[in-house]
């Protein structure tokens, strides 16, 4: 039995902190809280009306996938991870993650609601898990892992792949629109959400490092390569990024690059050994630790939650 899954009678009380690294990650998440009301999407409609039919088609399908996927992540947290993991610090993080995923889902739903005026098309997009085969394939893969009998460690990797790999190409495609100066509301929300998801992915890697009996490298590689092939198909066959003027082969390479970064963070050898083909993604917050706190991505951070001078905080307070 993994110590972090062992029954813990002290799980209802936060102090004293036992796992400082996990608690620090929770405080990082707390510091980066935001709400949809802070994102101005009023200027997006002008840009939306100038987009080509292909560009609109692409964005609508990406948003449809995103709108459903956060709910799947939350179902896994509610039904499995929050129940299985017994250490309070991780439960704090998972609880906060659920709130953030709700905000992401609300944001994507609001974007669809704003851009798409036809009510039938709206319903089609909101029900993408049933109506769109390309979205259904990704959703089915993620949902399969919620109910799988695999170990916590294996399912941890699967959901790190969902948040780290299944989202990566879509994030990059929206940042591509930012590079072109389009859709400021969509691209700003994408910046906030990609930063959050990067942090969630980093948290999965941290939890993995706390496992005494982690899955084998072979198992990890199998889960990650499976996710890579599904994501590559999504963005180069089902919903090709060439619709918005991106290069499909470069997108395939980018997804491999992201997968390598994830598996390295888990402590294993890279699978693909490729370089990042998208220069505009070099400084983007897809790694949760990519210095949101140093760069203050989107110039937003919850005031006073973490010191601006440094991110280290101590609990050695004299009570």
From Swiss-Prot:
Induction statement: Expressed early in the viral replicative cycle.
Binding site for Fe cation 1: 70, 101, 104
EC number(s) stated in the UniProt entry for this protein: 1.17.4.1
Residues that bind Fe cation 2: 101, 163, 197, 200
Domain of life: Viruses
Catalysis: reaction(s): a 2'-deoxyribonucleoside 5'-diphosphate + [thioredoxin]-disulfide + H2O = a ribonucleoside 5'-diphosphate + [thioredoxin]-dithiol
Key word Oxidoreductase present: yes
PANTHER family: RIBONUCLEOSIDE-DIPHOSPHATE REDUCTASE SMALL CHAIN, RIBONUCLEOSIDE-DIPHOSPHATE REDUCTASE SUBUNIT M2
Protein name stated in the entry: Ribonucleoside-diphosphate reductase small chain
Species assigned in the record: Variola virus
Source taxonomy: Viruses, Varidnaviria, Bamfordvirae, Nucleocytoviricota, Pokkesviricetes
Gene behind the chain: OPG048
């Amino acid at each position: 039995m993994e110590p972090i899954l062992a029954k813990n009678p002290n799980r209802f009380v936060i102090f004293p902190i036992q796992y400082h690294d996990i608690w620090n990650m929770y405080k990082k998440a707390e510091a980066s809280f935001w709400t949809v009301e802070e994102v101005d999407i009023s200027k997006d409609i002008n840009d939306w009306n100038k987009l080509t039919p292909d560009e609109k088609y692409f964005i609508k399908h990406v948003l449809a996938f995103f709108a459903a996927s956060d709910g799947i992540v939350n179902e896994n947290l509610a039904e499995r991870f929050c129940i299985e993991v017994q250490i309070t610090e991780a439960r704090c993080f998972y609880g906060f993650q659920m709130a953030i995923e709700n905000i992401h889902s609300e944001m994507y739903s609001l974007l669809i609601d704003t851009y798409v005026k036809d009510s039938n098309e709206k319903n089609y997009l909101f029900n993408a898990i049933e109506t769109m085969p390309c979205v259904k394939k990704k959703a089915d893969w993620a949902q399969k892992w919620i109910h799988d009998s695999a170990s916590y460690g294996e399912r941890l990797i699967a959901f790190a792949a969902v948040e780290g790999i299944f989202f990566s190409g879509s994030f990059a495609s929206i940042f591509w629109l930012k590079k072109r100066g389009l859709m400021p509301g969509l691209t700003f929300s994408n910046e906030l959400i990609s930063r959050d998801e990067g942090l969630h992915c980093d948290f999965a890697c941290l939890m993995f490092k706390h496992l005494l009996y982690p899955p084998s490298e072979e198992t990890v590689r199998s889960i990650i390569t499976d996710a890579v092939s599904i994501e590559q198909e999504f963005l180069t066959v089902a919903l090709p990024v060439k619709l918005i003027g991106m290069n499909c082969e470069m997108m395939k390479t980018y997804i491999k690059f992201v997968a390598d970064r994830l598996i390295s963070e888990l402590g294993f050898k890279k699978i693909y050994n490729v370089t990042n083909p998208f220069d505009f993604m070099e400084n983007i917050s897809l790694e949760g630790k990519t210095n949101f706190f140093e760069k203050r991505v989107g110039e937003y951070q919850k005031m006073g939650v973490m010191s601006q001078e440094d991110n280290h905080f101590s609990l050695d307070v004299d009570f």
